Swiss-Prot record:
Gene Ontology cellular component list: ribonucleoprotein complex; ribosome
UniProt-listed PROSITE patterns: RIBOSOMAL_S21
Taxonomic source organism: Bordetella pertussis (strain Tohama I / ATCC BAA-589 / NCTC 13251)
GO biological process entries: translation
Pfam families with a match to the protein in the record: Ribosomal_S21
InterPro entries per UniProt: Ribosomal_bS21, Ribosomal_bS21_CS, Ribosomal_bS21_sf
Listed GO MF terms: structural constituent of ribosome
Residue segments, region Disordered: 40-70
Family: Belongs to the bacterial ribosomal protein bS21 family.
Domain of life: Bacteria
Compositionally biased spans, kind Basic residues: 45-61
Name under which the protein is recorded: Small ribosomal subunit protein bS21
Keyword annotations of the record: Ribonucleoprotein, Ribosomal protein
Length: 70
């Protein structure tokens, strides 16, 4: 677990912001949410495959030229 030490004369809100930033960088919250409930291996594969397809189509869409506006 990430540790954040309070510096001298540092407000609690600033330390809390630093803690939240370190948690976000380590990906702890996303892992916690994914482990909150059991997901069958087939459901996990299906979800990951759907995300890959979505990324693929998004990449294709961003590489296409915009349609001509007449």
């Amino acid at each position: 677990m990430p540790i954040v030490r309070l510096k001298e004369n540092e407000p609690f809100e600033a330390a809390l912001r630093r803690f939240k930033r370190t948690i976000e960088k380590t990906g702890l919250l996303t892992e916690l949410r994914s482990r909150e409930f059991y997901e069958k291996p087939t459901a996990e594969r299906k979800r990951k495959h759907a995300a890959a397809v979505k990324r693929h189509y998004k990449r294709i869409r961003s590489q296409q030229l915009p349609p001509r506006l007449y």
